[in-house]
Amino acid sequence: MLQDKGLSESEEAFRAPGPALGEASNTSTTNAPEPALATPGLSGAALSSPPGQGADVAAAAAAAAEQTIENIKVGLHEKELWKKFHEAGTEMIITKAGRRMFPSYKVKVTGMNPKTKYILLIDIVPADDHRYKFCDNKWMVAGKAEPAMPGRLYVHPDSPATGAHWMRQLVSFQKLKLTNNHLDPFGHIILNSMHKYQPRLHIVKADENNAFGSKNTAFCTHVFPETSFISVTSYQNHKITQLKIENNPFAKGFRGSDDSDLRVARLQSKEYPVISKSIMRQRLVSSQLSAKPDVSPLHSAHQALQHYQYENGAHMQFAAAEPQDLPLNTFPTQRDSSLFYHCLKRRDSARHLDLPCKRSYLETPSSVGDDHYFRSPPPYDQQMLSPSYCSEVTPREACMYSSSGPEIAGVSAVDDLPPPPLSCNMWTSVSPYTSYSVQTMETVPYQPFPAHFTATTVMPRLPTIAAQSAQPPGNAHFSVYNQLSQSQVRERGPSASFPRERGLPGMCERKPPSPHLNTANEFLYSQSFSLTRESSLQYHSGMGTVENWTDG
């Protein structure tokens, strides 16, 4: 008991064990000095006065001092809240940097001498010698407690102060912080995790030096059992977490940030809410389309910004310098996407037609009217399969594709041909080049091949298939030609030598092509349009070994 021990001149005196936590009746203790030691200043007067009179003065002074300490009453603020936490098992977070307690330790003090100065301080002592663990939704003893940390005292920042100051309002220790850093240099109270502790409040009468710790210091200690807690690094019991959320206004980490809700509320209350850039861009384009030709784009943009509809349905209007000159133009909520799509397509086509390489194709007027671009677009399947769509694109993109004019050497238009089926096995039926022998042919009829002997400046608009073949396309071309024309070899006349150069295709073009080879040319054009100049050279080197050649 603190009554049986005198206080030393250091703060170690407050580390003495207090009353047992189980004794609910002994919630406060007092310590009064000896009568003779309580009035050291009166010792000389007592010696000079009669013996009976000096003893009476000392006894009266000691009784007054003892009565003052005993009359101090302390009440715990928010006691009902503390009881709720205590019933669930109060937990207090401890961190390296220090964490404040919640509920905060606040008391109401009465019965002090208004003119006497007091010092209020708190220490936190172990409640028992056990270590705890939270298992099966309850706290259980896990073993023996770790050695206690050196005790620290938290002195209230207002100390020392008169009794009138302390009794004027609540005394709050909300700035007290708990830490598990054993080397903490900030004066926080050091605790061990998963241990049970009991806070204690000490009221000390200040001496003539406004300090405490002298041998004749009077003090009292108040303990509230409902303020005991278990120190943890994170909350273990969900009930404690819920109580913290419901009662702690600063528990943002658990409640969830309401900043987004507040931001939305402020946004709705603003006069000019923010709208997305994509919506404004579409409205500007549509306003330019609806504007007259003599109206400038800036004027149209101003009309679009003059009035708009926000997402929540409320109509907002920008302040205009001359509202009578700018008509109100409300933009509809549902916009036709086809209008925007065809407008961009027409503008891109016009930009491509301005190129020099397209001027030769502008002589023939397009059969498609301008009103075609303002109709709703056909479905996706029709766009991919409709031949009219292909014929529409061909003259406008003539720089990329071969030609939409007359047919070449009896070959039909490229757009009219169906796309060839692409397959990895399309060359399996063709004999390889190594098995082909030129000497087996007696005579080979010659027919013009514009793709080989003319300048390769025009290329058909068909996908290349050179990468999918197992052999060079030139070899396959020659094999196919052999298969199709071998039946006509013996029907030709006298043979001729084949000393032909690449620069003499004019002599061959005078002969009309046979209908059978026209069919072969159509097949060749549909299957091997990715032939390069290297394949053409291979073809000429192979044909140079033929002895007899006829012009038909």
UniProtKB/Swiss-Prot annotation:
It is found in: Nucleus. GO terms for biological process: angiogenesis; embryonic hindlimb morphogenesis; embryonic limb morphogenesis; embryonic lung development; limb morphogenesis; lung development; morphogenesis of an epithelium; positive regulation of DNA-templated transcription. Keywords: Developmental protein, DNA-binding, Nucleus, Phosphoprotein, Transcription, Transcription regulation. Residues 1-50 are annotated as: Disordered. Transmembrane segments: none annotated. InterPro entries: p53-like_TF_DNA-bd_sf, T-box_DNA-bd, T-box_sf, TF_T-box, TF_T-box_CS. GO terms for molecular function: DNA-binding transcription factor activity; RNA polymerase II cis-regulatory region sequence-specific DNA binding. The modification Phosphoserine is found at residue 514. SUPFAM superfamilies: p53-like transcription factors. It holds the Pfam family T-box. The keyword Nucleus applies. Residues 76-256 bind DNA. One of its GO terms (cellular component) is nucleus. Residues 1-14 have a biased composition (Basic and acidic residues). The keyword Ubl conjugation does not apply. PANTHER family: T-BOX PROTEIN-RELATED, T-BOX TRANSCRIPTION FACTOR TBX4. Transcriptional regulator that has an essential role in the organogenesis of lungs, pelvis, and hindlimbs. This is T-box transcription factor TBX4. The lineage of its organism: Eukaryota, Metazoa, Chordata, Craniata, Vertebrata. The gene is Tbx4.
